Regions:
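Short helix-boundary/capping micro-motifs
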Residues: 12-28
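A short LG(V/I)-centered, amphipathic sequence patch enriched
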Residues: 40-57
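Alpha-helical linker/hinge and terminal dimerization helices associated
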Residues: 42-43, 64-86
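Central regulatory/effector-binding core of bacterial HTH transcription factors
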Residues: 92-151
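Flexible hinge/capping segments at coil-to-helix
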Residues: 155-169, 173-195
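Beta-alpha-beta core module
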Residues: 157-160, 229-277
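Secondary-structure junction motif
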Residues: 194-214
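A late-sequence structural motif
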Residues: 259-303
Length: 307
């Protein structure tokens, strides 16, 4: 039996006339009568009978009204429970990230979310050479992406872009380097240096391009590596200098130091990319909020350390 027709029968039992039911439900009296006739056919027995100038419910009709009431209660209860469930941050959330983004944020985020009932955060990392991390949003709930500036294509594609943090990028030098005594460097200081570079069009490589533009001469790039750990080892070993992210570069007691660079834009913006529909899920919202909080704490801790 159709729930909507059962509801019409309930309305008839409460309002007394087909006309009153029609007024309450916004349909014509003939439409109400037609639906009640269909319900009688489904029930296999008369549900109404003539009563004066109107109609009244039969014994079967009154019994079915009781059943309809029980069904309506069950539907309301189910909808209420579903509404409560949808407000809870439960279920699986998939996240993918570039390597250093995961290194900075994921251990702390996972630790904070481990005790949330019913929530499971599943994380993976991606090849940093991926042309556009936005291409991953159909396959993951949250995509962590880095860029010198937020790419216009992200919003052009209808994605929700949540800024998490802006990380400075520094010049990494061997401890014995001639520039090690300086507290801040300029592009002119770096003219003629040997570089350990990143793949073309990485955020680090774009800063090297800006240094080239300021100095008016090409940079001398001896090697290029995707992995920052290899770059750190090469710099510490005296093979050249490099652009590296401030928050994940290991520059304590390993033969490597970092210095800020003035005169060019030296930072990368880190954002969470999502399809708008997935961003509506409470579980996804909780993960993103936790990412934001951890990113803010990380940036604040480095600011305090620098101060």
């Amino acid at each position: 039996m159709d729930i909507k027709r059962l509801e019409l029968l309930r309305e008839l039992s409460e309002r007394g006339t087909v006309g009153a039911v029609a007024d309450a439900t916004g349909v014509t009296p003939s439409a109400v009568s037609q639906q009640l006739k269909v319900l009688e056919q489904e029930a296999g027995t008369p549900l109404t009978e003539p009563a004066g100038r109107g109609i009244a419910l039969t014994v079967a009709g009154r019994a079915l009204v009781q059943t309809a009431t029980e069904i309506a209660i069950a539907v309301e209860r189910a909808e209420s429970r579903w509404h409560d469930f949808m407000k809870q941050p439960a279920g699986e959330v998939t996240l993918t990230t570039f390597p250093t983004g995961g290194e900075m944020l994921l251990p702390q985020v996972l630790a904070r979310l481990v005790d949330v009932p019913g929530l499971r955060l599943v994380c993976t990392d991606q090849d940093p050479l991926l042309p556009d991390f936005a291409d991953l949003t159909p396959d993951f709930d949250i995509v962590l992406a880095d860029s010198p500036v937020n790419s216009p294509s992200w919003r052009d594609r209808g994605l929700l872009v949540v800024p998490l943090m802006s990380e400075p990028l520094d010049v990494a030098l061997p401890e014995s380097h001639r520039l090690a005594k300086k507290t801040k460097l300029t592009p002119k200081d770096l003219a003629g240096e040997i570089w350990i570079g990143a793949p073309a069009d990485f955020p680090y490589d774009r800063i090297l391009q800006e240094i080239e533009a300021v100095n008016g001469v090409p940079a001398i790039v001896a090697q290029r590596f995707m992995d920052n750990g290899i770059v750190e080892s090469m710099v510490a070993g005296g093979q050249g200098i490099a652009i590296l992210p401030r928050y994940t570069t290991r520059d304590r007691g390993n033969g490597l130091i970092t210095r800020p660079l003035a005169g060019v834009r030296t930072r990368r913006d880190i954002s969470a990319l999502m399809r708008p529909d997935r961003a509506e899920r409470p579980s996804v919202q909780l993960v993103v909020e936790t990412l934001k909080q951890e990113a803010q704490k990380l940036a604040a801790s480095h600011t305090q350390a620098a101060g």
